[in-house]
Amino acid sequence: MENIKIKKLAEKYGIFAKKSLGQNFIFDLNLTDKIASHAKISNQDHLIEIGSGAGSLTFSILKQNPKSLTIIEKDHRCIALLKEMKQYFSNKINTKITIIEGDFLEIDLKEIFDKNYKIISNLPYNIGTKILFLLLEHYQKIDLMILMFQKEVCQRIVAENNSKKYGRIAVMVNFLCQTRYLFDIAASNFTPAPKVESGLVEIIPRERPIFDIDLKLLEKITEIAFNQRRKMLRSSLKPLTKDVNLWLEKAEIAGDLRAENLTLEDFARLVRGIG
């Protein structure tokens, strides 16, 4: 199979990218090898790939001989290709390969996360952040995530306060994880080429949140604050309390600041001070 281009294999099974599924395929194994290398895969690692598509990244992962790989793929057209790939590797590596046909957003993840995993995936553009927030609910069962998004989404994930990209996603992700932007991926690497650039991020879950607070309340506060990000906090946070000035005073945060000015510690003080 190494002599067969993944693109030819996809053609064999009539697989082409569907816009409705947010698909953009990579056929360059040099690139997917580079992506997989950032997961630092050992033969003791259990991996999950979400949305394998035409299988280039799957192939690169399997070449690293992990202990197991669970592939979750919604597109029925891709299943036969994955089964052929599984057969190809069956006498070459010791990896236990499990193929699950289904929508990741509808699967019972408690059954999936029976052990700790590394996650590596080229996420569908249209539901990438939704998948990320779902994964964060199981952060204690995840050792590492290497994820591909639109470049703008990557920038929002790793953004720091006082920047235009800083928002709810940066706060929620970085409360639970350490994040790092790895590299740009040009649109020309995809078939079809999307209208935007992509990027790769490394997300390493912490053993526990960086601050011990009510995360559901943090989610609510960040949603309200960043939905009106140009407003000062004394105005944007009014819907959450009867006395916003007293709340901000208890949290030791100036009312004329905006959500984008706050650090993670500031948000933690807001959560603790609302009571």
Q: What are these model-derived regions, one by one?
A:
Residues 1-224, 265-272:
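Catalytic cores of RNA-modifying enzymes
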Residues 205, 222-275:
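C-terminal lobe and adjacent flexible extensions of AdoMet/dcAdoMet transferase-like proteins
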